Structures are given as structure tokens and as C-alpha cells.
């Protein structure tokens, strides 16, 4: 999984469109409410597997980010995977970020980014492997 296939959507036209069984385009929209949204097919696959494993909805705190929004986001990486549609910051009610990260590690043992934060887990499908605590 390397995020190679990234699709571009318009929230105005596609916001209610299902990108998978449990996720809609609008869930990945940048917090600045820009219309364009980039979403990686591989990322959606990982999120669906996480949802199936825990048997609970996965909530996306932050999906796609525009360059402008990312530059205003505290502690965001200059080349954040969110800017390319390859990342999501997620939480699951009743599941710790550490538990989410442990399962994501099984899905992405040699690739992808997994970051553990106090209230969410960052998951991305970059080609290289990266792990951190926020």
C-alpha cells in the first residue's frame, strides 16, 4: 500500500458520495472548507480494515489539508501526507490511539506513517515507513 492511486473530488458535487462502504467524500474535507478533496484509495482501504477489526465507526478528525490550511496548523509537517490525500487523523470511541496504532502496524508493517497522539492516531500510506509519538 503506497497511496499511488489518489482521486480528486469536489465536495459540492461529490460530498455525499461513498468512497467505500463506510466513508463519504465530505469526511475527508479540509477544515478550511475548500471544495477540492484528495483521497487515496489505499488510505480508504486501511481505514475500512481498521473499522472492521474494531467493529466500530472510525471518525476522521483531519483528512485532506490544503497547503494553506496545513501551513496554519500547529506542529504540522511542511510535507504533511495530509496535503496529498494520503493521511487521516482518526479516533474510535472506546479504543485508545495506541490500540489503533498497534493494529495499523499489522496492516502497514514496512510502509506508511503511524503517529500516536493523546486523542487520536495518525495513519498514512506513504511509501516509506515512519513512526512517532506526538
Regions found by a protein language model. Give the residues of each.
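Extracytoplasmic cell-surface/polysaccharide-interacting catalytic and binding patches
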Residues: 1-53, 116-118, 126-134
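Catalytic cores and adjacent binding grooves of peptidoglycan-active enzymes
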Residues: 5, 78-134
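A generic short-segment signal for beta-strand/edge and adjacent turn/coil regions
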Residues: 28-30, 53-62, 89-94
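Generic alpha-helical scaffold signal
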Residues: 33, 37-44, 63, 67, ...
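Extended, low-complexity, intrinsically disordered C-terminal regulatory tails
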Residues: 44-75
Amino acid at each position: 500500500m503506497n497511496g499511488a492511486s489518489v482521486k480528486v473530488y469536489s465536495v459540492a458535487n461529490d460530498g455525499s458520495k461513498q468512497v467505500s462502504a463506510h466513508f463519504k467524500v465530505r469526511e475527508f474535507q479540509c477544515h478550511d472548507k475548500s471544495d477540492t478533496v484528495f483521497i487515496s484509495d489505499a488510505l480508504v482501504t486501511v481505514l475500512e480494515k481498521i473499522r472492521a477489526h474494531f467493529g466500530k465507526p472510525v471518525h476522521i478528525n483531519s483528512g485532506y489539508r490544503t497547503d494553506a490550511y496545513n501551513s496554519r496548523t500547529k506542529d504540522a509537517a511542511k510535507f504533511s501526507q495530509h496535503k496529498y490525500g494520503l493521511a487521516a487523523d482518526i479516533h474510535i470511541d472506546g479504543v485508545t490511539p495506541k490500540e489503533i496504532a498497534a493494529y495499523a502496524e499489522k496492516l502497514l508493517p514496512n510502509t506508511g506513517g503511524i503517529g500516536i497522539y493523546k486523542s487520536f492516531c495518525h495513519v498514512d500510506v506513504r511509501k516509506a515507513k515512519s513512526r512517532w509519538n506526538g
